[in-house]
């Protein structure tokens, strides 16, 4: 939810700063066990409850529609991550950021199942991208990048999403975007 809540603001901050963005989806299922993170269902009940409070606060504060308990969450995000990588490779970072936003919105605002390749194809078309990216997302080079991005995340000590890294300085969470903006203004 936090990546969804921060995505548009991050794009605006990066654009205003003229920053170069590298989109690097990672497999949180592999990152969490190494970094001590727990999947949502394994967290203590009070943490799960407070997460919903914070989501509602940020959704209202940012005026972003959001289902606190979307129909398709948790959801397997590997195919969606590979689609983002395929779009980045074949259409560039701006297109990858656009499809990322569409995928996040699909889960958190529209209750669409991003584990369904038909839904991913629809999202590509809605972003004026060729649905051929679905086939490209299954190619070995895309999977290799996904694996590399996940390993890189582990190697640099990332432990959650969203994480923004600027000049080797890490900012975790959409609530750190003010710090991201300040760093980019240096």
Task: Report residues per predicted region.
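Structural alpha/beta surface segment adjacent to cysteine/selenocysteine redox centers
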Residues: 4-107
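C-terminal cap of thioredoxin/glutaredoxin-like
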Residues: 1-24, 89, 98, 102-186
